[in-house]
From Swiss-Prot:
Its EC number is 3.4.24.-. This is Protease HtpX homolog. Belongs to the peptidase M48B family. The chain crosses the membrane at residues 16-36, 39-59, 161-181, 192-212. It is found in: Cell membrane. HAMAP family: Pept_M48_protease_HtpX (MF_00188). Binds 1 zinc ion per subunit. The lineage of its organism: Archaea, Methanobacteriati, Thermoplasmatota, Thermoplasmata, Thermoplasmatales. It is a multi-pass membrane protein. PANTHER family: PROTEASE HTPX, PROTEASE HTPX HOMOLOG. Its cofactor is Zn(2+). It comes from Thermoplasma volcanium (strain ATCC 51530 / DSM 4299 / JCM 9571 / NBRC 15438 / GSS1). The active site is at 150.
Length: 308
């Protein structure tokens, strides 16, 4: 890896680490504020706080454990038949070897839009799903780059990271909701104010979690660019093709799994890439998205391509 590529990757890591530290500090500050409110106003019971924490944790763990099976049902994904998809399985094994991890299991998703996603759990193991339309629009090199992106998610344990930090806004929201009913009636006004403050804090935490997710996507893009031969360029054309052929995935809870979640007009692939290179993208362009704006992804890949 040449120095410039190392610098680009180090910058992404530093931003991600800084944001995670910020989340931790903010979470600690929220707990301190809540403890002070409890001490001054007696708004909350420690037993209820513990109960809410255990309930949310159990719900998240259950979702993590059985999530892949739910994803398989929603996206109609089935384990790839080696006799039919042996060449794709071979690419997955090749890319996994380049990344130094055990090959994940390949699944084929029978949905109408082109995309790919990685998912895992301690029970289901590591999986990569590719939708059938994606196989029809990407060449082998582009498919290899997309798989490099998805394996990057698995290598960096992104599902576990997002699940862990996603606990914070969920917990704060439940604390806010139950504060309205668990406080001393003499402090009803204080309870309402505290609940509203906590709901705002929960919303802000969700924005931060989305930001972390966008950085994980950039990190996965960098993984493909730096571990797959000509990965940056092939990932650019793959992204453009996916958008050009109309990904219908929206910003839903499941869309965080996907390689891309933007709908745009049909344009020539190269024209679209050039458009993204020069597009002015504001800070609010992807504030509520779990994926970076395509223009940001293309520019990052340009930097990685130039430095490789």
């Amino acid at each position: 890896m040449v120095p410039m590529a190392s610098n680009n990757l180090a910058y992404i890591k530093l931003r991600l680490l800084s944001l995670l530290v910020g989340l931790g500090i903010a979470a600690l500050a929220s707990l301190i504020i809540y403890a002070v409110a409890y001490y001054l106003f007696g708004i909350y019971s420690i037993g209820i706080i513990f109960g809410v924490f255990v309930l949310v944790l159990m719900m998240d763990l259950l979702q993590w454990f059985i999530g892949p099976y739910i994803v398989d049902m929603v996206y109609r994904a089935k384990k790839a038949d080696p006799n039919r998809y042996g060449n794709i399985i071979a690419i997955v094994e090749e890319v996994a070897k380049l990344n130094g991890i055990r090959p994940p299991t390949l699944y084929i998703s029978e949905v109408s839009f082109p995309n790919a996603f990685a998912y895992e759990s301690p029970i289901a193991g590591r999986r990569i799903a590719i939708t059938r339309p994606l196989l029809g629009i990407l060449n082998e090199d582009e498919l290899r780059a997309v798989i490099g992106h998805e394996i990057g998610h698995l290598k960096h344990h992104d599902s576990a990271v997002i699940m862990a930090i996603g606990l914070i806004p969920t917990l704060i929201f439940y604390f806010a909701y139950t504060t309205l009913f668990a406080g001393d009636r003499r402090n009803g006004g204080s309870a309402i104010i505290l609940a509203l403050v906590l709901m705002v804090v929960s919303f802000l935490f969700n924005i931060m979690v989305l930001s972390v997710n966008r950085l994980r996507e950039s990190y996965a893009d960098a993984n493909a660019a730096l571990t797959i031969p000509n990965g940056a360029r092939n990932l650019q054309t793959a992204l453009a093709k996916i958008v050009r052929y109309g990904s219908s995935a929206k910003n839903t809870a499941a869309s965080m799994l996907l390689f891309a979640n933007y709908d745009m007009d049909r344009e020539d692939v190269e024209t679209l890439i050039d458009k993204w290179r020069t597009m002015r993208v504001g800070i609010l362009s992807d504030l509520f998205s779990d994926h970076p704006h395509p223009a940001k992804r293309i520019r990052l890949l340009d930097k990685l391509q130039d430095s490789s």
